[in-house]
Regions:
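Glycine-rich phosphate/diphosphate-binding loop of Rossmann-like nucleotide-binding domains
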Residues: 6-30
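Anion-binding alpha/beta catalytic cores of soluble intermediary-metabolism enzymes, centered on
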Residues: 1-12, 35-38, 44-123
Length: 123
């Protein structure tokens, strides 16, 4: 059964990151993965093309996908756009509608600051 992946490059470096992710998917498909992908607009790119940072059509495609790869959204180009139409609203809309509430990022604690950090070895 094929997996459906929605690729949302977004803005700035997100476009380059998404292009490389697609190369990985293509290579994995060559090695036996069964995945299809579709690229759509989100964030500032969607705002520029559609006047909305996340269109209902893209949201529906996201709901129908097995996975979503999102590059990055935002940039100074859209600083003066109404808050509800800013690129970040597209990301927030995806999180809300898909009930995604975690944003995991790698963290590094410098030894000299470990005692002041909220990151602990055990809880």
């Amino acid at each position: 059964m094929s997996s459906k992946i929605l690729v949302l490059p977004g803005d700035g470096i997100g476009v380059e990151v998404a292009d490389q992710a697609i190369r990985v998917i293509d290579k994995l498909n060559d090695l036996g993965l069964d995945a299809t992908y579709e690229k759509e607009l989100v964030g500032g790119a969607s705002y520029d093309a559609n006047g909305e940072p996340l269109t209902p059509e893209v949201l529906e495609k996201a709901k129908q996908s097995d996975a979503i790869l999102l590059g990055a959204v935002g940039g100074s180009k859209w600083d003066d756009v109404e808050r509800s139409k800013r690129p970040e609203a597209g990301l927030l809309g995806l999180r809300k509608e898909l009930e995604l509430f975690a944003n995991l990022r790698p963290a590094l604690v410098f030894e000299a600051l470990a005692s002041a950090s909220t990151l602990k070895d055990d809880v």
